[in-house]
């Protein structure tokens, strides 16, 4: 009888990742588990098929061979139910279903790496652009100095677990299966502590606050992460420490907005400067510069100052500062100033020669109403 496609067996797409494959297998294998279907031989066959499919698709090498050559590429490599041996199906079953049946978990190592930590660091825009060094204080778990991380009272030592013989796991029979589970006595440590340390209560770790100096490279932006290896929580039973990930968050700036390597700002200019032109001071992150405003400048016009932006942290050219001019309408006018504006308005007449956008707008309105009348 020809075998079904392994992807169809698990009900996953051919580009499914390991997480989705494991999730699908776990759900279906739990459904067709022989212990739940003791009088259903079809369920047992289905369970065998699921186990075989998962063994192939959960292995990068076997999956690659299967994707290329189909079942011919993996013949003899799938152990299936009852054929995988000590390192085959029982390991798969323990990895996937350990928590359902009271423990499990593949791997024999008793050491455990410490957890990674994350710290969100708020920076001013200037700090992010130029780089800086910041001091942070984080809560973490460190090795207990009293017992040197052993968890045992000073002068005593942990003893080999009598239940698992130091392996950290025990083999349990459940129905048709012999599976490995985490030892219920030592919880996987392989050792038991009869006289625990008073400071860490046998855990081997205590909580402390740790102060670190973090060097922030120039050009970072919100969302960037800085990894500090070994600065996470201490491992257990001699395991390595985790890492600390510093997440950058740049605070809003009162003048500038950042988009990648470019900076943006609005620059207010007077009515007369917009009409006649002139030079104005524009702020940049490294000082003021003079910007020449052309005559008859309209509100919203953009001026680009080359290389006045940000040099990206991952390399590349320095960005630009893009200035958007905003023409301000004069306020708090004196009587004389109002007279002058009245004279100016009269000199311009009723036409729109001096207001090209206004003329374009009125032309558009006229076409709109002409179309309605048709």
Swiss-Prot record:
GO-annotated cellular components: cytoplasm
Record has Metal-binding as a keyword: yes
Chief localisation class: cytoplasm
Binding site residues for Zn(2+) 1: 144, 147, 197, 200
Pfam families assigned: DnaJ, DnaJ_C, DnaJ_CXXCXGXG
Binding site for Zn(2+) 2: 161, 164, 183, 186
Taxonomic superkingdom: Bacteria
Segments forming CR-type zinc fingers: 131-209
Cofactor binding summary note: Binds 2 Zn(2+) ions per monomer.
Keyword terms: Chaperone, Cytoplasm, DNA replication, Metal-binding, Repeat, Stress response, Zinc, Zinc-finger
Domain J stretches: 5-70
Subcellular location: Cytoplasm
Family membership noted in the UniProt record: Belongs to the DnaJ family.
Protein role: Participates actively in the response to hyperosmotic and heat shock by preventing the aggregation of stress-denatured proteins and by disaggregating proteins, also in an autonomous, DnaK-independent fashion. Unfolded proteins bind initially to DnaJ; upon interaction with the DnaJ-bound protein, DnaK hydrolyzes its bound ATP, resulting in the formation of a stable complex. GrpE releases ADP from DnaK; ATP binding to DnaK triggers the release of the substrate protein, thus completing the reaction cycle.
Subunit structure: Homodimer.
Domain remarks: The J domain is necessary and sufficient to stimulate DnaK ATPase activity. Zinc center 1 plays an important role in the autonomous, DnaK-independent chaperone activity of DnaJ. Zinc center 2 is essential for interaction with DnaK and for DnaJ activity.
Database matches in NCBIfam families: DnaJ_bact, PRK10767.1
Identification of the protein by name: Chaperone protein DnaJ
Organism name: Marinomonas sp. (strain MWYL1)
